[in-house]
Amino acid sequence: ILDRLIILRETEGLKINFIIQVDTLCHRLPNFIEKAARAGVKRVFIGLENINPDNLLGAKKQQNKITEYRKMLLAWKKARVLTYCGYILGFPNDTPEAILHDIRVIQKELPVDLLEFFYLTPLPGSEDHRKLHEAGSWMDSDMNKYDLNHAVAGHPRMTIEEWKKVYHDAWETYYTDEHIETILRRAIATGVSPGKALFLITWFKGCIGIEGIHPLEGGFLRMKVRRTRRSGLRLESPLIFYPKYLIETLRKQMRWIDLYLDLRSIYRKVKRDPSRKDYMDLAITPVTDEEVETMELFKSDVAQAFVTKIRRAEKVRHGEPA
């Protein structure tokens, strides 16, 4: 498929651009990332899920290896493709402090462009849902909330209110002005379009802060239809609905404009920096074998145990004594 798309772009001159979703080991496929970029991939969604090996094992994400995250993300950077990653909050070992700590580690050590957060959700029909049902655990009866954007089950180490709060804190922690500047600097230094990064950051930050919804469920203008209501809710009078909708829309658009202008000032600051193309930080530093000893990503006991396990497996794979 990629070969044919490359021909259409490079020989036929068709301007094909698209987004793909990949796993965290896609960089191990020979030439896959390079071909994807040539075929027209401009953005890639990666299910990062978590940086805690125990959480990944609990989510049955054995293919997600924290030792491969930087290699994979830097490979997409080299191909000048913008990355956005999904990150799940609410694994059994999670606490508000641990979640925010891990997000700061990601900011510092992983070259992720956009990060979007989801609640760990026992989707109806899944093994997790069945286990909770058989155990008699509380789960929200409103099926409309099972969209990964609501807390719908209990958590062993957080109350529902704490879980909700850290969900919103996670967005605010990642999308600070300081880190947005870092994202834009990394984009310029690695050949990714800073303008596209700014557009997406504005969208993500505004949907959460202004609309109060997940970015995948919204945009820059919220459309509401008076007669489209959830079952059981009465229709509002046109004399109430339309004036309220107009005022709400105008207020929100002013907030969108303010947000864009604030972020645009960060963008201009970065673009005016004469040394912008020479920017370097820990996250976009080339991978070395020694980093597992120095990076905070690998410093927890769980991470160290995982690194030891991976090293032992590599030795066995190469016929060396473990």
Regions from the PLM with identified roles:
Residues 182-231:
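Non-catalytic, C-terminal membrane-associated alpha-helical segments of glycosyltransferases
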